[in-house]
A protein has these predicted regions:
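TM-adjacent membrane-interface loops and short helices in multi-pass inner/ER membrane proteins
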Residues: 264-302, 311, 315-321
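Alpha-helical transmembrane segments of multi-pass inner-membrane proteins
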Residues: 30-42, 53-63, 85-92, 103-117, ...
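A membrane-periplasm/extracellular boundary helix in multi-pass inner-membrane enzymes
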Residues: 142, 146-151, 202, 210, ...
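Transmembrane signal-anchor hairpin modules in multi-pass inner-membrane enzymes, especially those
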Residues: 1-135, 183, 187-192, 219-234, ...
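Short active-site alpha-helical segment characteristic of glycosyltransferases
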Residues: 308
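Short, conserved phosphate/pyrophosphate- and ester-handling motifs at nucleotide-, phospho-/glycolipid
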Residues: 169, 263, 366
Length: 558
């Protein structure tokens, strides 16, 4: 796979190690950023909130310790991202789930921290960082292909015949490999044969949607570059078409279409949820606990598959406006002065690819993708940016805001790491963690393992758990059954089913309970009525557009 790495490419490796007076000032910072990018990539792309918070704090911290005198010359570029974090905090305290909501602020903190880094100094060498990133692209793509064929069971890198690589999620891995292809294509140090390495990795992910977006992004790149590469584009398009035909013959194309329809339904349900609290949102991460009440079809989704709607739900319409303002203003700056910006064609193509895929997937949950997006958008922070969109801040105010953000992210990092510890040991923790569904669930699970069923019921009642947290309610119901309080358990379970008629997992759990403990005649009549209502609902659009909807036969229960 290294056959395409020619002599020029090998000599180009010295680009990472040479002494250059122009970049020597920030060489240490940029080396640190490259190492951090590689570390986040290996750690599941920063999907874990604790890892994302630690990386965000580290990004801000290196600005302070690496430069005794720094100036945030373009802090106005960070205002919108800072607003996202503060709006998320307000939403978290107003209608969230304690530390659970705070943990879901990690992506927004990564946006803010990385933006601070790329606007903290005026002599930041973008070319140096991109030069190192190219080798990360090539090495990570080659390693992913090797693991796919040699060690397919390595840490979940391959699942159901699809390459998930470092993200353990095939679609986001496909986005990374598509960006890697464009990044290598934009480099004079790599040949078109070298570009085959990330392209093969992209094909192995079997992500049809990303493959189509990749062709679109490649077309944008070639148009902006004004390069006559019609045969090259045709070859890439042909290979993507072959992938689509193969997926169609294997039957997975039908599954992909069904998945796309399901995500459209999720967006519809998410908009209904957002309508209940449009200005401050429903709280970061609250989608997982709330969507069962509004779902229009039978699906299970802990995270909504639309990045923009996720921001709307987490922080309200103002948070979404702040994010879109940041992206749009940076894109305007890049387009306006793209002739003066190195790698502007790749930057535009990469940004478009990521922002389009945000519409139908969860890429925004990965700190690595967030960092890349801000890195590319920060090309609009140069001294030739649109002056009409700029307004000054005294440097003492900029530094004060930086230290304030550093303190907030440090606090969130501490809370999230302590929360992870409580989940691991199954402890209840201080009272401020009682509203956290995951902390409480593991605490109640530990009580169940110890046979303290009465304590589980008392704890559930004393915490006044929200009815939508079905996992916690099921622990209470199971404890009631174990205490031989079948009537109370049956009543709680039927109420939960009635509220969540399209919760497939809940139906399966209820079936197991009723098969084992039995059900009263009154309960059977009520259950049959719920079944009829559920069947009528899933036979109507939009649920009827999905083939995986299940009609339950409750009358067969013993």
């Amino acid at each position: 796979m290294l056959i395409g790495l020619n002599g020029d490419s090998i000599r180009g490796l010295r680009f990472l190690f040479i002494y250059d007076e122009v970049i020597e000032l920030n060489k240490r910072t940029q080396w640190t950023l490259l190492c951090l990018l590689g570390a986040i990539l290996l750690l599941q792309g920063g999907y874990n909130s604790s890892i994302s918070f630690i990386a965000s704090f580290f990004l801000l911290f290196i600005i302070v310790i690496d430069r005794s005198k720094f100036e945030i010359l373009y802090f106005q570029r960070n205002i919108s991202l800072a607003a996202m974090v503060f709006l998320g905090l307000i939403s978290s305290f107003a209608c969230g789930y304690g530390s659970y909501s705070l943990a879901h602020l990690a992506p927004y903190c990564m946006f803010l921290s990385s933006s601070f880094v790329f606007t903290s100094v005026d002599d930041f060498d973008f070319n140096y960082l991109i030069g190192g990133l190219r080798y990360i692209c090539f090495i990570s793509s080659a390693a992913a292909i090797l693991l796919f064929f040699v060690f397919p069971s390595f840490f979940g890198y391959v699942s159901a015949g699809r390459l998930q690589a470092y993200f353990q999620y095939a679609n986001t891995a496909a986005v990374w490999f598509a960006l890697s292809f464009l990044l290598l294509l934009d480099s004079p140090l790599f040949t078109k044969i070298d570009c085959l390495v990330p392209f093969i990795a992209l094909v192995l992910t079997r992500s049809v949607a990303v493959a189509i977006l990749f062709v679109f992004g490649l077309m944008i790149y070639l148009i902006l570059e004004k390069r006559s590469m019609a045969s090259f584009l045709l070859a890439v398009f042909g290979l993507v078409l072959i992938l689509c035909i193969y997926e169609m013959m294997s039957g997975r194309i039908v599954e992909s279409v069904q998945t796309f329809i399901e995500r459209i339904i999720q967006i519809y349900d998410g908009l209904r949820l957002a309508g209940s609290s449009p200005f401050i949102g429903i709280g970061p991460g609250a989608w997982r606990q709330s969507y069962r009440f509004v779902q229009s079809a039978q699906y299970s989704a802990n995270v909504i598959h639309c990045g923009y709607l996720q921001i709307l739900l987490d922080g309200g319409i103002f948070a979404l406006t702040a994010f879109l303002w940041f992206c749009i203003t940076r894109m305007i700056c890049i387009f306006k002065e793209r002739s003066n910006i190195p790698h502007s064609s790749f930057v535009v193509a990469g940004i478009v690819l990521m922002l389009l895929h945000f519409m139908v997937d969860i890429d925004i949950q990965f700190a690595f993708i967030d960092l890349l997006l801000v890195l590319f958008l920060s090309r609009g922070n140069e001294k030739y940016s649109i002056k009409e969109l700029s307004f000054g801040f005294p440097n003492w105010a900029n530094k004060g805001c930086l230290l304030l953000c550093l303190s907030i992210i440090f606090g969130l990092t501490t809370i999230t790491c302590y929360r992870s510890y409580l989940i691991e040991v199954g402890d209840r923790g201080p009272s401020c963690f009682e509203k956290d569904p995951e902390v409480t669930e593991n605490y109640l699970l530990r009580l169940c393992d110890e046979g303290e069923y009465a304590s589980v019921v008392d704890a559930a009642d004393s915490l006044r758990l929200r009815s939508e947290t079905s996992e916690l309610q099921l622990l209470k119901i199971g404890s009631l059954y174990c205490m031989d309080m079948r009537d109370d358990a049956e009543e709680c379970l039927l109420e939960l089913i009635d509220m969540q008629k399209k919760n497939v997992d809940l139906y399966k759990t209820a079936t197991a309970y009723f098969d084992y403990y039995g059900i009263s005649n009154e309960g059977r009549i009520r259950l049959t009525r719920i079944e009829n209502q559920a069947n009528e609902m899933i036979e109507r659009p939009p649920a009827s557009y999905l083939r995986n909807q299940v009609l339950y036969e409750w009358t067969q229960l013993n």
